[in-house]
């Protein structure tokens, strides 16, 4: 569906660029109608004799040049929905389609339905900055609530007009002859396959949808129920069952206390990796609000709804708290040392009933090397009588249970694999760029990117939550918004300047990797731990800096870091058009620059006292 409103045809259609260009454009843009001399209000906008002595002929379009483009977005989670809001807001004449393989929106929050699934950062920091929700039930809201928030955001901003659900991407191929992406799509409800094309392709799949099963001998020989945390069987009754759980990451930390509380369950938790379990993020704010536990009372939620200033102040404190702990990620800082001591004391207290578990689970590496999670109820569950903490390595899986290296068979009725995802990997479908290079081949040694959002050899392809995109502290949704804003600026440049291919230089990708490697040397992420952030000794998952650093880095694109292919024109200044603007042709808002929303009035008597630029340095 086209992002509305579109401009009148005379404003965006291409006129003749030079005497032999018609054939070129007919071949490159067969579906684009063009006229040689558009008129508006009874006069032609083209000069009667606009050919210069060099043979240059004006491109008969207004300076804004909002030529038609097609954009395909893969994924309807936080990132895809953001594009469904901002592209129609900021761009015109863009035909936008958002494909998602699921039956509903929300991405990972639609797919993950295991018991206890929730965000492990404060809910009010895990939302769009422009669409705050005062009604979160908990400091760590459950998955269904997050999915409902995303669905309501889709409805609020009419994003559903662009979304096609149950549409699975099968392949994406760059066609250099037409400068288009050819995307093969399968409708899952009918098994019909078709091909779509786009000028720009945005991968908004995220990193939490390609399931990673454990590589253990005999996994499929188990005769009982087996499920992955991301492929949960909601119909299975765990009551009175012996449950084996493999994993100690974020999902396992949420699943274990949920299953432990069910009637007559017996849990065998196979945990090899040591990990830090932090106190709840935002604990000081909870104490200030007088919260008993993590649930917001009805009175507190009503206060958020009825008092915008109070709600905004609460949000500000949460965000500031997340951003002020960046020093925790740097080796040797006082904050890092203090955090480790605090975590040790907190974990000892919560594991006091079985102190030996503390010795088994306490890491040798610094807090933050692995992803920190508060894990409400996790440590408390480990000390309960119906939970066995097993550190022995798994040798194999048999039909009746799990055999550890000491030869013991741990009989179970159901096996839960909380083993995460293939993060930082290419999509599970072929993506082919210049000269037939596949992304899997391109990333064979390392997932490479430029500022996390583009990679060389793949023109007009942008990534949300690509390599080196996650954050060690602060707001992930602000990272998503910042990357999305950058991508939309790129689309506008492509549209306005008659660019048909835009690809980051390989040298700039190499420079970004060199910067990233140098930055991470002094961080806790290079400590001795096993983390999805890393591939060997290289950090591939995290942004090399703080969230505020990322927001500023993406604020003003360095256009010189890209290579461009243009429409065949005699002069690359043809983007200047015919000397007219859209406002003049439409006869409206001819002095818009005097309207209050476009005015930037300096402070008197000292312009440098402008408070906005004291908070944040000016940039364009």
Task: Describe the residue ranges of each PLM region.
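Rossmann-like dinucleotide-binding core of oxidoreductases
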Residues: 61-68, 72-73, 78-95, 102-104, ...
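Conserved N-terminal/central alpha/beta ligand/cofactor-binding core
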Residues: 124-154, 158, 308-362
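A conserved short coil-to-beta-strand element within the FAD-binding core of flavoproteins
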Residues: 165-180, 387-405
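C-terminal, flexible cofactor-proximal segment of oxidoreductases
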Residues: 22, 279, 308, 449, ...
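Feature captures the FAD/FMN-dependent oxidoreductase FAD-binding
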Residues: 137-208
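Central helical "cap/lid" subdomain
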Residues: 215-226, 400-453
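Beta1-alpha1 glycine-rich phosphate/pyrophosphate-binding loop at the start
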Residues: 9, 19, 37, 66-69, ...
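Extreme N-terminal leader/targeting segments of oxidoreductases
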Residues: 1-71, 89-93, 114, 194, ...
């Amino acid at each position: 569906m086209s992002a509305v409103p579109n401009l009148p045809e005379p404003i965006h259609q291409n006129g003749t660029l030079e005497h032999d260009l018609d054939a070129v454009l007919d071949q490159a843009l067969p579906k684009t109608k063009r006229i040689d001399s558009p008129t508006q209000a009874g006069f032609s906008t083209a000069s009667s004799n606009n050919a210069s002595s060099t043979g240059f002929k004006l491109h008969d379009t207004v300076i804004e040049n909002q030529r038609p483009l097609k954009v395909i977005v893969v994924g309807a989670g936080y990132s895809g929905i953001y594009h469904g809001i901002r592209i129609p807001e900021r761009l015109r004449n863009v035909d936008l389609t958002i494909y998602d393989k699921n039956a509903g929106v929300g991405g990972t929050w639609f797919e993950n339905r295991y018991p206890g699934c929730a965000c492990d950062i404060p809910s009010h920091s895990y939302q769009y900055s422009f669409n705050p929700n005062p009604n979160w039930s908990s400091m760590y809201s459950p998955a269904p609530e997050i999915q409902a928030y995303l669905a309501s955001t889709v409805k609020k901003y009419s994003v559903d007009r662009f979304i096609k659900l149950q549409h699975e991407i099968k392949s994406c191929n760059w066609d250099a002859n037409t400068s288009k992406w050819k995307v093969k799509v399968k409708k899952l409800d009918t098994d019909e396959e078709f091909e779509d094309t786009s000028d720009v392709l945005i991968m908004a799949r995220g990193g939490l949808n390609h399931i990673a099963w454990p590589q253990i001998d005999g996994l499929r020989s188990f005769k009982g129920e087996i499920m992955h945390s991301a492929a949960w069987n909601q119909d299975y009754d765990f009551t009175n069952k012996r449950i084996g759980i493999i994993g100690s990451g974020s999902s396992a930390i949420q699943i274990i206390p949920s299953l432990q509380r069910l009637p007559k369950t017996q849990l065998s938790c196979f945990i090899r990796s040591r990990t830090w379990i932090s106190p709840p993020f935002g604990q000081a704010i909870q104490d200030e609000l007088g919260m008993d536990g993590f649930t917001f009372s009805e009175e507190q939620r009503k206060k958020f709804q009825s008092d915008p200033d109070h709600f905004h102040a609460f949000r500000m404190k949460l965000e500031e708290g997340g951003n002020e702990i960046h020093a925790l990620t740097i080796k040797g800082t006082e904050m890092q040392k203090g955090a480790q001591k605090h975590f040790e004391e907190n974990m000892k207290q919560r594991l006091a009933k079985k102190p030996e578990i503390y010795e088994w689970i306490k890491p040798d590496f610094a807090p933050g090397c692995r992803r920190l999670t508060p894990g409400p109820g996790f440590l408390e569950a480990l000390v309960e009588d119906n939970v066995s903490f097993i550190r022995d390595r798994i040798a194999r899986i048999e039909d009746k249970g799990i055999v550890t290296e000491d030869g013991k068979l741990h009989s179970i009725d159901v096996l839960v694999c909380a083993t995460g995802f293939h993060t930082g990997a290419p999509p599970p479908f072929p993506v082919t760029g210049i000269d037939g290079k596949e992304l899997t081949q391109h990333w064979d040694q390392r997932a490479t990117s430029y500022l996390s959002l583009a990679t060389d050899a793949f023109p007009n392809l942008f990534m949300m939550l690509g390599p080196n995109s996650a954050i060690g502290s602060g707001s992930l949704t602000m990272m998503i918004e910042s990357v999305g804003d950058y991508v939309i600026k790129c689309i506008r440049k492509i549209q306005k300047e008659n660019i048909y291919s835009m690809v980051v230089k390989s040298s700039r990708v190499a420079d970004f990797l060199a910067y990233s490697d140098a930055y991470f040397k002094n961080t806790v992420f290079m400590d001795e731990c096993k983390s999805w952030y890393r591939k060997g000794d290289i950090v591939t998952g995290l942004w090399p800096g703080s969230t505020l650093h990322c927001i500023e880095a993406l604020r003003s694109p360095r256009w010189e870091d890209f290579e461009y292919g243009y429409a065949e024109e005699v002069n690359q200044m043809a983007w200047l058009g015919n000397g007219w603007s859209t406002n003049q042709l439409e006869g409206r808002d001819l002095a818009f620059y005097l309207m209050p929303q476009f005015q930037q009035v300096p402070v008197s008597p000292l312009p440098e006292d402008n408070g906005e630029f004291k908070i944040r340095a000016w940039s364009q």
